[in-house]
Every structure is written in C-alpha cells, then in structure tokens.
Amino acid sequence: MDGFRIIIAEKADAGRRIAYFLSGGQVKSHRAKGTSYLEFEYNGSKTYLIPLSGHIVEADFESGYSDWNKIDLSDLIDARIVKNIKNKVAYQTLQAFRGKVEEIVIATDYDREGELIGVEALDIIKEGKEEIRRAKFSALTKNEILDSFKNLIGVNYSLADAADARESIDLIWGSVLTRFFSVTTGRLGKSFLSAGRVQTPTLAIVVDREREIQSFRPERYWTISITFDKDGQFKARYPENIKDQDTAEKIYEAIKGKNGRVSSYTSKEDHIRRPAPFSTTEFLREASRIGIMPTKAMSIAENLYMRGLISYPRTDNTVYPRSINLKSVLKKLENTAYSKYVKEIETFDRILPSRGRIETTDHPPIYPVDSPKEQLKGDYGRVYDLILRHFLSTLYRDGKKTVAEAEIYVNGYTFKAAGQHTTDRGWTEIYGYDPKDVYLPELTEGEDLKAIDWNIQREETKPPPRYDMSSLLKKMEELNLGTKSTRHDIIGKLIERGFIEGNPVKPTPLGMAFIDAVRSVNSHIADPEMTAKLEEDMDRIEKNEMSKNDVVEESKKMLHEVLSHFLTKTADVKDIITKGINAGQEIGDCPFHEGKKIMVIRDRFTYTVRCEDPSCKINFRIKRNGSITLSDQKCPVCGLPMIKIIRKGQSPEIKCIDPDCSYNRENEDYGECPADHGRLVLRQSKYGKRFLGCSNYPKCTVTYPLPQMGRITKTGEVCPYCGAPILALSRNGRKWKFCPNMQCEYNKKRKPEAAVEKSVRKKGRNASKS
C-alpha cells in the first residue's frame, strides 16, 4: 500500500461527495474495524478517503478528579488536561494507515473546529515523512471541490490552537462552576445545575431585561393629532408627548375646530436598501422571524450544506468574494420558484451585489449553490427558500420610495405630518417584505387645509420588550458573547436546562435566582466583559499574536479569583438558588387552601404542579414536553379547576388538578390490556411521545405506540383479531378507526389504517422508550 494518498473528511456525507467529484463517480467502499472508508484513483494515485464523525479525541481531566463531592475545586482548575479517545473506531482505522502514507490531505470544514479535528487525525496517522496539505472549500459542489484540490494550502495550526484553547477553557470553567453550584444546592445526578463562562452572561442579559420590565413604572402622557382632508385623509401630530394634562387640554382647546395652513413641505426620492449578504448570525435571526428556532435552523443549514445545496453556514462574512461566479450560480437556480427574478438578474449588464460591513477570507456569506432535485419539505424547504430569496435580493435592484414631510400651522401651534410612497418595490418583491406606505398628498407652502377631526389621547409609556431569538442573537454578537458557531447552542442549552423559556424569551424563576446568586458574591461571571476578553484572546491565538498556553493560563487565574468569591458565600448562594427553584410559576388559586396558589415548578425533565401549602394533596409531576396553563373549564366530576397541557402536534390534554379525581383515570384509560386484563393507560415517554402502556407495568410490559399527530378517542370496541381496544384518530378533518397494535390484521384489512401505520412507524418508534 506504499505511495498512496489519504484524505480526511469531517463527516460521511461530505466524504462521499468529495470522493465522487474527485473520482468522477468511480468509488469503491470498504469496511474495516467497524468503519467505512472509500477508495478511488485521483491524479493517477491511489487515494483513500476516511470520513470521521466529528472529534476523534476529547479533552478531560486526568483520572482521579471524577468525585464531585470530594475534589477541591481549586485543584480542579489546575488539574492536567488529557485527550481521551472518543471515537475508537476512527482511531483504529487511522492507526492502521500510520506509516504507509505518502500524502495526507485534510478536507474537514475550514473553521476552528474543523481544523482541530483535522490536526487530531494528523497526530494519529502521521510519522513525519508524509506531505501534509489542506483542501479549503466553502461548498460541497463539483467545481469547489476540484478547485480546492488543485490549489491545496498548508494546515493552519493557529486555527486549531484557538479551538483547542476554547475546548480546554470551556472544560475547566464549565466543570468548576457546574460542580460548585450543583454540590452547593444539592442538585446532583440528572438534575445538576449547569453553568458556563458564556451561558451565564447570556442568561444575565435575559434576566436584566426581565428586571427592567418588572421594575418599570409607566408614566402618563398626552398626544394630540388632527386629521386633514385633501384628496384623501392624513394625520398630523403635535411633535411632543405632553406630560402635563392641563397643558395638553389647553393646546387641544386652542386647535379644536380650527383648520390648518402649510408652513413647510419637503419631498425627496429615497432608496429601500437591499439587505447585506447572510452571515450566520443574520441568517439565524431571520430564521427565528419565520418561526424556526436557532438550533433547528443551524441543524437544517448544515444538512443543506452536506447535500450540496448551500454554502458553508458558519461565517461572519457579509461580502461576496470575487471568486464566486454569480452567473454560474444563477444558472443553477433557474428552475426554482423564483425563476422569473433569476432570469431578470441574468439580463443585467453588471451584477453588483450588496455589501455588508464585515469582510473575511475564510468563507463567503451563506448563499444557495444549487437547486434541489426534489421539493424540500417542511422547515427544510422554508430554510432553503429563505436563503434563496435573500441571495436573490442581494443581487436585485434597490427599491425606491418618495418620502415627504410637512409642518402645518394651526392657531399658534405647529403640527407635523410624514408620509411615504413606494414607487419601485425592487428587491422587496422577492423577499416578501411589504414596505408600508403612509399617505401624505403633495402640498404647497401657504396652502390652507381643511381639518375634519381633532383628537387628544392619554397614553402610557411602555416597558422595554423582552428579547426574542433574533434580538438576543444580535445582543450576544454586540457583546462578543460566543461565536457565530456557538451562539445558537448556548441559547439552546439555557432552554434545555430550564433557565429560560418561550419566544420572546423569559427567564424562569431558576434563571432569575441563578443570576441573583452569581451577583450576590460580586464574582463578575455574569458580566459580558470577562468572557468577551477570553473571546478576543482566542482570536489573537488564531492571528499568532498569543499562544494557546498563555490564554489558558490567563483564564485559570480569572477562574481562581471567581471561585474565591463563591467559596466565601456558599450559604448565601444556596439560599438564593433554592428559593428560586421552589418559587415556580403561579397559575391560579388553590381550591383546598384559601389564599394559597397553585404553582408550576419547572425542573430539568418535569413540571411539578403543586400547592404552596406543603400539606395539600395537589402535588404531581408531568413530563416537561409542553406548556401548562389553568383551563377555564371546571371538572365535570368534582367541580375543581382543570389544567391544560399543550404539546406540539397533539390535541390539548385536560386534567383535573385533584390527582385522585376519577376524571383523570377515566380519560387516561383506553381499555383492557389483552395480555393480563390490566388497563391500557395513556403515557408520555421521556422523548415526549405518547403511547399506551399496561397499568400493571413492570409485571406486564405491553406497550402500543400511537400516532403523534391528531386527536385520539375511545370507541368502546375491541379488536376481533388481537383483543386490543379499537381507537379513533381525528386529523385534518378526517376520522378513522385503528387498532393500536400496528401489526394487527385489523389494520391490514382496512385501507385508511395504512396511513396510520406509516405515521406511527415514522413518528412513534421511540414511544415506548419510557
């Protein structure tokens, strides 16, 4: 095997596309030591491509530091970090080629993480005599791949060092802070209390805004407006908010019933500027505006990249490099839903795309590189559509509008009116953005205007809005919290760990208490400046301005100082967080204890619904895979209030707040178990999937997966083939019966049930993994 080439790819899908393009489709697949690799000829040389699945090794502390209760946290900060094998199969495959290779080409993603993965592979496979090169590409297309292998570059070890430093720093900070808060509050095991150097200041942003809202005191003010009529109605407003009621009424009485005279009028043509090309942050912000959460949007974008449909989705760049052949890209987009605009852009004498403020050389902005051969479904189609229409908008023409302003004199007071009229929608026609026109007719100075309505309105100042996903991502970028590749994950972790919820984003009582505890000891880890300084240092590693070891050591000194503050006030931290954990969200009055409230307490995996009075029988847990509100219905059995549990894709579940009420048992009971005559009860798995399980579990392990979408009701019938209860499914205006035993002959003999079976197999296969 002497004299051959090895190519290291980051993922299997990317590896297959690279091998296909380099070989012209002539690829052999091999499997050895539990992993697959590809063989082909390239440039007259035998070539093997080894696809990895992310990191081969991972950073951890050396052995002896695993006991959370016994290890001194100061010692943990300075513990030696080792690299343990994470992917044994990939490690053994690379080892098998060690010393037998003439050339190694790293073809992982060209960013910090990708470079570190490539360097990890090099450390395993190289002996020192091999030629080591790097393929840099930004899209998994034929032209990009072939061009990158014709123009191989050197490995960027500084890029890998920056990623390695981040991995070490995040390990140290995350482990020390998480252990401190978890041990201090007694939240161990699955309920551990997570903390980190980036997620803590990000949580603080959300908490600070909530505190602003809570402490906000509205102030009254008055506004005055006049409606005029000239070829249509328009409004002019008094230019100030008037804080004094007497002054407002004085002005109103002076202008009421009076006409106006134009004292000035200006009109000008203006542009509706095209958006800048997509950076990662702006893409995620726009995706959140169409209802796709950042973590999901990034996952979909990575999938589209692997399929060769879009460029690399992790980038700060907002300027298309000259190397992109825009006309060639447009040619591939001619058969999309926007073909009309594609063909129009192709007729431009020169295509001059918009430009953003940030220009980098690692990757271009996100743009479509090909059109899908088959229609993309669901959110995949929506994300691709967003990227496509955004790209076309950056190439199209600016919109145009006429902007007008007028000052109108009314009995000693000046009122102002403004209007705009879109004369050319331009790019907004593609993007689906509809500029709002405000009517203001053409006026001349000295012209008399007829007033038809005079209005005085009392208003109140409003609190600042909560952050939504879009504005939170923007704020993180402004404060240099995280990177383009990590911000969506940080938000996702805060949601998963019960610190924040909803969109707009609201902190949970636990999130509020956590930040209060952090700030009670003056530790500064909630301040963005500390983590932003470390982000800047990691940028300096990439630029060869600092060494990896210097940055890691500096971060350790910071953490020692932070820890010393916490250790002096352990009891205070415990008290604040414990109160936050027990606070919960109030959803209504308790019917059994006057003056007490029913609370919903959110844990990492469950909701606890309980009364403030610890002796009350209202105390039960529900798996945390939906939202809980107090229903306006009363229980038909006992008359007590009911709660509504809303899970995505399922009809709301209504429960009586009395856990012993027969209403709950009757509505969860779907019939007799055919195996042991127990009751088949509706359950929710830890993954949020609904299924039927026998009430005699664990003695009886019978379970039936259920369709995850639609409303399921009892029919009272029993299956003549297997004895299970026959159920009815209502969905999309249709209703049909089915047996929950999806292999049953009943379903095979009834045509509509084929659709049910397919739905269950696809969406309910994990339902019984409780």
UniProtKB/Swiss-Prot annotation:
<dbReference type="GO" id="GO:0006310">
    <property type="term" value="P:DNA recombination"/>
</dbReference>
<dbReference type="Pfam" id="PF01396">
    <property type="entry name" value="Zn_ribbon_Top1"/>
</dbReference>
<feature type="zinc finger region" description="C4-type 2">
    <location>
        <begin position="673"/>
        <end position="700"/>
    </location>
</feature>
<dbReference type="InterPro" id="IPR034144">
    <property type="entry name" value="TOPRIM_TopoIII"/>
</dbReference>
<keyword id="KW-0677">Repeat</keyword>
<dbReference type="Pfam" id="PF01751">
    <property type="entry name" value="Toprim"/>
</dbReference>
<dbReference type="InterPro" id="IPR028612">
    <property type="entry name" value="Topoisom_1_IA"/>
</dbReference>
<dbReference type="InterPro" id="IPR013497">
    <property type="entry name" value="Topo_IA_cen"/>
</dbReference>
<protein>
    <recommendedName>
        <fullName>DNA topoisomerase 1</fullName>
        <ecNumber>5.6.2.1</ecNumber>
    </recommendedName>
</protein>
<dbReference type="InterPro" id="IPR003601">
    <property type="entry name" value="Topo_IA_2"/>
</dbReference>
<dbReference type="Pfam" id="PF01131">
    <property type="entry name" value="Topoisom_bac"/>
</dbReference>
<dbReference type="InterPro" id="IPR013498">
    <property type="entry name" value="Topo_IA_Znf"/>
</dbReference>
<dbReference type="InterPro" id="IPR013825">
    <property type="entry name" value="Topo_IA_cen_sub2"/>
</dbReference>
<dbReference type="InterPro" id="IPR023406">
    <property type="entry name" value="Topo_IA_AS"/>
</dbReference>
<dbReference type="InterPro" id="IPR006171">
    <property type="entry name" value="TOPRIM_dom"/>
</dbReference>
<feature type="zinc finger region" description="C4-type 3">
    <location>
        <begin position="719"/>
        <end position="744"/>
    </location>
</feature>
<dbReference type="GO" id="GO:0005694">
    <property type="term" value="C:chromosome"/>
</dbReference>
<feature type="site" description="Interaction with DNA">
    <location>
        <position position="170"/>
    </location>
</feature>
<dbReference type="GO" id="GO:0006265">
    <property type="term" value="P:DNA topological change"/>
</dbReference>
<dbReference type="GO" id="GO:0003917">
    <property type="term" value="F:DNA topoisomerase type I (single strand cut, ATP-independent) activity"/>
</dbReference>
<feature type="zinc finger region" description="C4-type 1">
    <location>
        <begin position="611"/>
        <end position="638"/>
    </location>
</feature>
<dbReference type="InterPro" id="IPR003602">
    <property type="entry name" value="Topo_IA_DNA-bd_dom"/>
</dbReference>
<keyword id="KW-0863">Zinc-finger</keyword>
<keyword id="KW-0862">Zinc</keyword>
<comment type="function">
    <text>Releases the supercoiling and torsional tension of DNA, which is introduced during the DNA replication and transcription, by transiently cleaving and rejoining one strand of the DNA duplex. Introduces a single-strand break via transesterification at a target site in duplex DNA. The scissile phosphodiester is attacked by the catalytic tyrosine of the enzyme, resulting in the formation of a DNA-(5'-phosphotyrosyl)-enzyme intermediate and the expulsion of a 3'-OH DNA strand. The free DNA strand then undergoes passage around the unbroken strand, thus removing DNA supercoils.</text>
</comment>
<comment type="subunit">
    <text>Monomer.</text>
</comment>
<dbReference type="InterPro" id="IPR023405">
    <property type="entry name" value="Topo_IA_core_domain"/>
</dbReference>
<feature type="domain" description="Toprim">
    <location>
        <begin position="4"/>
        <end position="140"/>
    </location>
</feature>
<feature type="site" description="Interaction with DNA">
    <location>
        <position position="166"/>
    </location>
</feature>
<feature type="site" description="Interaction with DNA">
    <location>
        <position position="497"/>
    </location>
</feature>
<dbReference type="GO" id="GO:0006281">
    <property type="term" value="P:DNA repair"/>
</dbReference>
<dbReference type="InterPro" id="IPR000380">
    <property type="entry name" value="Topo_IA"/>
</dbReference>
<feature type="binding site">
    <location>
        <position position="109"/>
    </location>
    <ligand>
        <name>Mg(2+)</name>
    </ligand>
</feature>
<dbReference type="GO" id="GO:0003677">
    <property type="term" value="F:DNA binding"/>
</dbReference>
<feature type="site" description="Interaction with DNA">
    <location>
        <position position="314"/>
    </location>
</feature>
<keyword id="KW-0413">Isomerase</keyword>
<feature type="binding site">
    <location>
        <position position="10"/>
    </location>
    <ligand>
        <name>Mg(2+)</name>
    </ligand>
</feature>
<feature type="region of interest" description="Interaction with DNA">
    <location>
        <begin position="194"/>
        <end position="199"/>
    </location>
</feature>
<comment type="similarity">
    <text>Belongs to the type IA topoisomerase family.</text>
</comment>
<feature type="site" description="Interaction with DNA">
    <location>
        <position position="55"/>
    </location>
</feature>
<dbReference type="GO" id="GO:0008270">
    <property type="term" value="F:zinc ion binding"/>
</dbReference>
<keyword id="KW-0799">Topoisomerase</keyword>
